Design a protein with these regions (language model features):
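Short, flexible loop/turn elements at secondary-structure junctions
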Residues: 82-85, 99, 110, 139, ...
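Conserved P-loop NTPase motor module
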Residues: 1-21, 25-32, 36, 216, ...
Length: 559
């Protein structure tokens, strides 16, 4: 009886040669199985010659184990790089539409090329008209404005006055119960500022009292409370014994939320600004904040978006992408183990996919990332690693039993990819350089560029109708009836620009992303337009077409 181990070795050799020689290797392996011992020995010698000819001797055992997918398996509408094997670029690799909402993790040491692939991801998202939000920790992404296709992007300098933003996390998103929001927001504060259960208790008491006084629970809000109000309330709390120590930590955290740029950011009575950025292509520069403040702001934004999307009807259809740098601060494995349970951010990461949101994590220390985050990432892209703990963490995630040492030998721009779906084995890709002049875009250029793009925040009275979490919407143009002027203009634009993306269409019509989305939804509900997945020069895009009813209305707008 033939040695079973020898059969496995021959099978592995055929698999390694198949990407180079194609289906011919399937035929050779089938012949090997059918031959007698002498015939198998001849085939073994032949395979060794083929391997010597086509697989370079410099190709390490670990790299040789990274067997590439077929060209058909590697194809995707959103190209990320070239499949690399035996020192050769074989064919493009890309993600597919339905894979984005299952999330992506891009991991590698500093300088390995993570930001480069981040640039490429944003470019392909713009080409497919998919909105994105970038949490930029080191002011890396503003230079994309030098590219014409990124002129639809807005850049905000969080905590700095160049292009400021306001966001009051105490205002719950539409449809969210204030008490539910209070508890989740307090957990986010505790994570960011390393607070214990005693401080959580006092925070809950303070925010609850402020909500009660402002009429939040009774839908009678005239002016939304801010963290300054919570700080004032906390200072008047009567505490004794251990609670006095808890109060000291509570005041420390609340003071951070009310000081300097963080105070300007958070202490607003309106959320028009944050609602605006969640509907477009936006880069948020966070270098003006401390590490703890960055963590709180990012987590609060993600929590707000999660609950905001819950109130919408989009389910499991790729709607937008969020790119998060330094992700271990947001999804911390250490914090998860301290609480002994899934954190609010872990829950958000796991659930937000249902609402059409793709999260892309970038980090250099996967060993510090939450296990929930790594376990719930469909695509893992691992670039060069230098730390043994990180290499071990990634070898487990990538299911590299014997080839983990390759993670320490990857060149800049190379990565090992593992998908939890169409391609069963990890494989190697090469990511092209995104040529960009770093440091080209200055603060003054950002100020001038953004002066007409920043949302009008209105007066400080914020929500004045007494509705909890109700979003304030500017009045639409036209008379508000069927076939009004704005609807007719939208229908005409569909005829004149049939393959246009929604961002460009809204810009031509002078609409914000929110206003345009509302108008489009109304036309869909009336049966005047329909969405179709079609192929354009930019690739496969969701396009808008008039229905017969829409064409009739355009021909006879007065009827």
């Amino acid at each position: 009886m033939a040695d079973k181990g020898n059969f496995n070795n021959i099978r592995q050799l055929c698999l390694r040669l198949r990407p180079i020689l194609g289906v011919r290797m399937d035929q050779i392996y089938a012949a090997y199985l059918a031959e007698d011992p002498d015939g198998r020995e001849q085939i073994e010698h032949y395979l060794e010659l083929l391997a010597a000819k086509h697989i370079p001797q410099s190709l390490g055992q670990e790299e040789a184990e990274l067997i590439p997918p077929s060209q058909e398996q590697a194809q995707g509408e959103y190209p990320l790089g070239q499949v690399l094997y035996s020192g050769k670029h074989l064919y493009p690799f890309g993600l597919r539409e339905n894979e984005w909402i299952q999330h992506m993790a891009i991991l590698g040491r500093s300088g390995s090329g993570k930001t480069n692939i981040g640039f490429s991801i944003l470019k392909t998202l713009v080409q497919h008209d998919k909105p994105f939000l970038v949490f930029d920790w080191k002011r890396n992404y503003r230079d994309l404005l030098a590219w014409p296709e990124f002129h639809v992007v807005e850049v905000y300098t969080i905590g700095r006055s160049i292009a400021p933003l306001t966001f009051n996390p105490l205002i719950p998103p539409t449809g969210t119960d204030p008490k539910t929001w209070l508890k989740k927001l307090n957990e986010v504060i505790a994570h960011a500022y390393c607070l214990g259960n005693g401080v959580l208790y006092l925070l809950q008491q303070a925010v609850d009292a402020v909500y009660e006084e402002a009429g939040v629970y009774d839908n009678l809000v005239q002016s939304w409370p801010t963290f300054k109000d919570v700080l004032t309330k906390a200072r008047t709390m009567d505490t004794r014994g251990r609670e006095a120590g808890w109060l000291s930590s509570t005041l420390r955290a609340l003071s951070s939320l009310c000081f300097g740029g963080m105070g300007d950011l958070l202490n607003s009575s309106s959320n028009r600004s944050i609602d605006h950025i969640l509907d477009g292509n936006v880069i948020l520069e966070l270098d003006g904040l401390s590490q703890a403040d960055k963590t709180f702001f990012v987590q609060a934004c993600l929590l707000y978006l999660h609950h905001k999307k819950m109130a919408e009807n989009v389910r499991e259809h790729f709607d937008r992408c969020i790119l998060i740098e330094e992700a271990h601060h947001i999804l911390s494995g250490q914090r998860t183990s301290l609480t002994g349970a899934e954190s609010v951010m872990d829950t958000t990461y796991r659930e937000i996919r249902e609402f059409g949101v793709s999260l892309v994590l970038l980090d250099q220390m996967p060993s510090k990332l939450s296990g929930f985050a790594l376990a719930n990432s469909y695509a893992t892209i691992c670039m060069s690693m230098s730390n043994r703990a990180d290499i071990n963490a990634m070898s487990q995630t990538l299911l590299l039993d014997t080839g983990k040492d390759v993670l320490g030998t990857l060149e800049v721009g190379q990565a090992v990819v593992k998908l939890q779906g169409r391609i069963p084995r990890p494989f190697l890709i090469s990511i092209p350089e995104f040529r960009i002049e770093k440091g080209r875009v200055t603060d003054e250029q950002i100020r001038d560029y953004m002066k007409d793009k920043m949302p009008q925040l209105g007066t400080e009275d914020g929500v004045s109708d007494g509705t909890v979490g109700e979003e304030q919407e500017p009045m639409e143009k036209g008379d508000g009836g069927p076939g009004n002027a704005l609807e007719i203009a939208f229908l005409k634009d569909v005829v004149d620009n049939p393959d246009s993306g929604v961002a460009a269409r809204y810009k031509r019509l002078g609409l914000s992303g929110r206003q345009g989305q509302k108008l489009k939804t109304g036309l869909l509900d009336q049966g005047l337009i329909e969405e179709q997945l079609g192929t354009t020069q930019a690739g496969r895009l969701m396009t808008i077409r008039l229905t017969e009813q829409g064409r009739q209305l355009l021909l006879n707008p007065g009827e």
